[in-house]
C-alpha cells in the first residue's frame, strides 16, 4: 500500500486540516478521539483525490459530502485556486476504506463560494459537480441540508467523520478505515473566549465570524486530512449537515475546531444544485 502525502498547511491564523499531495511523505491519514465506522452508516461521506506523480496514484487530500446526486460539498481551501481544473480531481464514494479497488468519479465543474477569504477562511465552501448522476444505494446517498430556521446547540447529537490523523503526528494505519467521533457544538461567544484565554498570539489571532461554527472538545475533533468533511447532527429524525471542516489549531488538542456554517450559505448552495 502506498503512502499518503501529508502537510500541515499553516495560514496566518490557524491550521487547515488538509492533506497535501506535493510536499513530503508520511503514513496515511482518522479523526482525533474517534472509532471505526461500518459501511453504510455515513453514505454521503466522500474522499476527494488529487493525482500524485510521486506515488503515481490518486491520493486523498480532503473529505466532502454528497448533498445532491450530482453535487459534492467540500471546503474551498481544498481546491488549488479559483480557476482550478476539475480534471485534476476525483471523488471516491460509498466506501469506508481508502484505496480499495474502485472506480473514482470525475468532476465536471468546481464552484468556490464568491465570498471565500483564504486568510480568514470565511465562507470556506466549494461545490463540485460530478460528470454523471450518482446511483443511490445503502452506501451512497445525499445528506440533508438544514433549514434557515433550524437551530443547533450543544444538546444536539452531532458527529464528525473522516480519514484524518488520529493525533497530530499519529496517522491512520492500514486498512485506512473511516473514523467517526461524537462532538458537541459550542456557541461562537464561548468559542471566542476559549481562544482568547490562550497565551499564544496564534490562538488570540483566530477570528470567528457568524458564518463559522465551533464544535469539538479536548481530544475529540478533526485533524490533517479531515478538511472539507461534514459535521452532521440528528434532528427531526434525519441527519442534517450543519458544518464543513475548515480550520483549527493543534488537531483538537485543547480548543474547539472551526467549521464553515452551512446555514450561512444555503441560498448560494441551492442556487447551484437545483
Swiss-Prot record:
Principal EC category: hydrolase
Q: Does Nucleus show up as a keyword for this record? A: no
Question: Which Gene Ontology CC terms are recorded?
Answer: extracellular region; extracellular space
Pfam assignment, any one = Trypsin
Location (main, coarse): secreted
Which domain of life does the UniProt lineage start with? Answer: Eukaryota
Q: Where is the Peptidase S1 domain?
A: 31-274
Q: Which InterPro entries match?
A: Peptidase_S1_PA, Peptidase_S1_PA_chymotrypsin, Peptidase_S1A, Ser/Thr_Proteases_Immune/Dev, Trypsin_dom, TRYPSIN_HIS, TRYPSIN_SER
> Could you tell me the Gene Ontology terms of the biological process aspect for this record?
blastocyst hatching; embryo implantation; proteolysis
> What function is annotated for this protein?
Involved in embryo hatching and implantation.
Q: Which family does it belong to?
A: Belongs to the peptidase S1 family.
Q: What is the name of the protein in this document?
A: Serine protease 28
- Origin organism lineage: Eukaryota, Metazoa, Chordata, Craniata, Vertebrata
- What is the gene name? Prss28
Amino acid at each position: 500500500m502506498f503512502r499518503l502525502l501529508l502537510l500541515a498547511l499553516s495560514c496566518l491564523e490557524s491550521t487547515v486540516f488538509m492533506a497535501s499531495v506535493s510536499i513530503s511523505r508520511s503514513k496515511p491519514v482518522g479523526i482525533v478521539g474517534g472509532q471505526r465506522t461500518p459501511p453504510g452508516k455515513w453514505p454521503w461521506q466522500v474522499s476527494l483525490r488529487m493525482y500524485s506523480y510521486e506515488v503515481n496514484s490518486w491520493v486523498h487530500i480532503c473529505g466532502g459530502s454528497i448533498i445532491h446526486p450530482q453535487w459534492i460539498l467540500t471546503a474551498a481551501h481544498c481546491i488549488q485556486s479559483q480557476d482550478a481544473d476539475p480534471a485534476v480531481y476525483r471523488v471516491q464514494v460509498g466506501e469506508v476504506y481508502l484505496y480499495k479497488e474502485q472506480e473514482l468519479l470525475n468532476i465536471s465543474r468546481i464552484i468556490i463560494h464568491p465570498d471565500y477569504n483564504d486568510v480568514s477562511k470565511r465562507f470556506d465552501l466549494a461545490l463540485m459537480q460530478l460528470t454523471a448522476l450518482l446511483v443511490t444505494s445503502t452506501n451512497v446517498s445525499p445528506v440533508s441540508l438544514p433549514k434557515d430556521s433550524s437551530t443547533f446547540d450543544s444538546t444536539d447529537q452531532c458527529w464528525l467523520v473522516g480519514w484524518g490523523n488520529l493525533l497530530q503526528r499519529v496517522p491512520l494505519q492500514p486498512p485506512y478505515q473511516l473514523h467517526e467521533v461524537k462532538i458537541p457544538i459550542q456557541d461562537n461567544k464561548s468559542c471566542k473566549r476559549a481562544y482568547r484565554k490562550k497565551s499564544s498570539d496564534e490562538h488570540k489571532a483566530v477570528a470567528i465570524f457568524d458564518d463559522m461554527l465551533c464544535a469539538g472538545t479536548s481530544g475529540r475533533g478533526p485533524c490533517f486530512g479531515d478538511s472539507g468533511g461534514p459535521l452532521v447532527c440528528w434532528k427531526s429524525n434525519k441527519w442534517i449537515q450543519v458544518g464543513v471542516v475548515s480550520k483549527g489549531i493543534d488537531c483538537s488538542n485543547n480548543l474547539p475546531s472551526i467549521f464553515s456554517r452551512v446555514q450561512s450559505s444555503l441560498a448560494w448552495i441551492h442556487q447551484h444544485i437545483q
